[in-house]
Amino acid sequence: AVAIAKANAIAQGEPVRLAPVKGVGEVSWVTPILKNGMEVPVKEKADLLLSANAAAMAAGANFVNSQLFLINEQKYFASSDGSYIDQDIHRIWPNFTVTAIDKASGRFRTRNAFSSPVGMGYEYLDGGNSIALPNGLKAYNDRYDIVEDAAQAARHAVEKLKAPTVKPGKYDLVLDPSNLFLTIHENVGHPLELDRVLGYEANYAGTSFA
């Protein structure tokens, strides 16, 4: 960290003056969880993923790839302002990709899980608090049902496979927020990173227009 700070100082136009911050002393913080995913047996986790795979295959998928990410970070933050913060951070992310294939044409379509990485424990997977939407769809808030979503994803992939090709032309486009925030991330977020601010090489997404 010291070496990086010294290297960055070479390109520094003027001294950096940090805003005064009052130290919080010795404190600790733990992600509020109801069930520690690290303590759940591996077999139970594997069985859950296999159940999701089976549900997707039964609903029309040809392939399923599922994962369960569990992270427990132990962080200690110390600052010259007098803050010493011990952090115990938990994150969980169940994810999958289902694929439906038209064997006659070789075309295929996919759909990913509707889950999100969240700062919760294994209780995130208990399937409660789902939100019923039109046409039998379900959305999820602070709980998630990976088996139910996998079956729904397979049906969506099959529907996409049967959908007609869009004819060339100009259309009004309605973007889902999950697509829009990715567009903003790539085309605005990366161009505003340090290499672009300092006038260095263009980032991997291309030249900035932000």
Predicted regions and their residues:
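Active-site bordering "gate/hinge" segments
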Residues: 1-210
